[in-house]
A protein has these predicted regions:
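Extended hydrophobic/aromatic segments used for targeting, binding, or gating
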Residues: 275, 296-297, 307-345, 425-430
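Intrinsic-disorder-associated, low-complexity terminal segments enriched in Asp/Asn/His/Tyr and depleted
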Residues: 18, 38-41
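Membrane-embedded catalytic scaffold of the fatty acid hydroxylase/desaturase
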Residues: 151-272, 341-428
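Intrinsically disordered, low-complexity repeat/linker tracts enriched for polar/charged residues
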Residues: 4-16, 20, 26, 53
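Alpha-helical bilayer-embedded segments of polytopic membrane proteins, i.e.
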Residues: 113-157, 232-247, 273-322
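Low-complexity, highly charged intrinsically disordered N-terminal segments
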Residues: 72-124, 128
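Short, non-transmembrane cytosolic segments of multipass membrane proteins
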Residues: 45-48, 66-94, 233-244
């Protein structure tokens, strides 16, 4: 029980307002389910002072390479930021810290209501889509059911799953919407994705030799990689990857390249293989066994329901592939050498995220359907802020880029997709 000086109390779970100013507010921590320890924050911000380092269990830059330090400078700054002095980089970092702190100070009930509303809407859409596919032999039901299921899967992966797994909603302390408990509608297990995406890609964004997302070990996506004859297949591999993107990511997350180099043991690989096998079996049973089987029993629509589910997954994969490739591969997004991050400060880390990422311009609906990854620059600066806040901070980030003479890469979806594909074709050649 805690006395309130003013204002009212809103229950985050229900949105209901309780009590009058001056009364007592009671807070309850559920003992029915205990949340595991929060994941270490390796994707957003490092402690700012000696006092904050002493007060947190987060690893420091000195202990964990790839996390930004407080003072110093990298051995070499990237070309796009070579004109900045150490003092300017430090001030830029403080300005971006202030933007983040402002959002954190105002984050609350409306944000919680937003994500719960999206989750409810997505689940109803998925249920409706699967229900229509139970009668998929009728063209109208087939088209509507496939469309609804496609959109539901896109929303679950992009706006919900990806962002929940970044810990954007961990502050709610809701066991059902937490980065340590959420399992998304994607073949690769959540924990595997968090390892390769959160812990590695966001830490080493576009650092050649560190960020495995630069080419995903199958594509040549940077001029510094020596050309080999197999790179002629760049466009073919990328086109084939798009419709089966979730399976490609599941294979990528196994880190077979690290097994070959001895960085990852075969025991670890077998553990990961079992995890992927269990997840893949569940996804296969849900999409390609349960829904078609029920449709066949009820209406004789089993084959049509199977085709509809295959289409929904394929279209989701193509969309996710397109959006993700727009994040770092369009013209204007820089890559970095290891010496450019050796000794980088907090401000330098911010600079790298800004000039190594690319946005997509468009409508509010388009931003939502990309999971707000259309605000890739803002997402890489603040990956643990609610995605619904990126549109709010984007003008401030763009103004900072302009004031410090840094590029802010953005453009319409088709232009960014075309730019990424142009790079795929260009780097297929010597």
């Amino acid at each position: 029980l805690t006395p309130r000086r003013s204002g009212q109390v809103t229950a985050l779970r229900t949105g209901q307002v309780h009590g009058e100013p001056g009364g007592l507010a009671q807070t309850c921590v559920s003992a029915a389910r205990v949340l595991p320890q929060d994941r270490p924050d390796t994707t957003s911000w490092a402690p700012r002072t000696a006092e904050s380092r002493a007060a947190t269990s987060r690893p420091t830059a000195a202990a964990t390479p790839g996390l930004p330090g407080v003072v110093g400078s990298p051995a070499v700054r990237p070309p796009g930021a070579a004109h900045l002095t150490d003092a300017q980089v430090a001030e830029l970092g403080r300005e971006l810290d202030a933007i983040r702190d402002d959002v954190l100070a105002r984050r609350g009930a409306s944000d919680a209501a937003y994500i719960r509303r999206v989750i409810r809407w997505q689940r109803r859409l998925e249920l409706g889509g699967r229900a229509l596919l139970l009668n998929a032999r009728h063209p109208a039901a087939f088209v509507a059911g496939t469309a609804m299921l496609t959109v539901a899967k896109i929303v679950e992966n992009m706006e919900i799953g990806h962002n929940v797994l970044h810990g954007q909603w961990d502050w709610m302390r809701d066991p059902d919407i937490h980065s340590t408990t959420w399992e998304w509608d994607f073949v690769t297990p959540s924990r595997a994705w968090q390892n390769t995406h959160n812990d590695l890609h966001h830490r080493w964004t576009n650092v050649v030799g560190k960020d495995r997302d630069v080419g995903y070990n199958v594509l040549r996506m940077d001029e510094s990689e020596p050309w080999r004859p197999r790179h002629l297949l760049n466009p073919v591999i990328n086109a084939g990857l798009a419709p089966i993107f979730e399976w490609g990511i599941a294979l990528y997350d196994l880190e077979l390249d690290r097994v070959r180099t001895g960085e990852k043991s075969r025991e670890e690989l077998m553990t990961d293989l079992r995890s992927v096998g269990v997840k893949a079996a569940r996804q296969f049973a849900k999409d390609y066994v349960a829904t078609p089987a029920v449709a066949e029993v009820l209406t004789g629509s089993g084959k049509a329901a199977l085709v509809g589910t295959l289409l929904a997954n394929g279209l989701r994969n193509i969309w996710a592939h397109a959006v993700i490739f727009c994040g770092h591969f369009p013209e204007g997004a820089e890559t970095f050498s290891e010496e450019m991050v050796d000794g980088e400060t907090r401000g330098d880390w911010y600079v790298r995220q800004m000039i190594g990422s690319a946005n997509i311009s468009g409508s509010q609906l388009m931003h939502f359907m990309t999971g707000n990854l259309s605000h890739q620059v803002e997402h890489h600066l603040f990956p643990d802020l609610p995605s619904s806040r990126y549109a709010e901070v984007a003008p401030k980030v763009r103004e900072i880029c302009a004031r410090y003479g840094l590029p802010y890469t953005t453009g319409p979806l088709l232009r960014q997709v075309g730019s990424a594909w142009k790079k795929v074709f260009r780097l297929a050649l010597p």
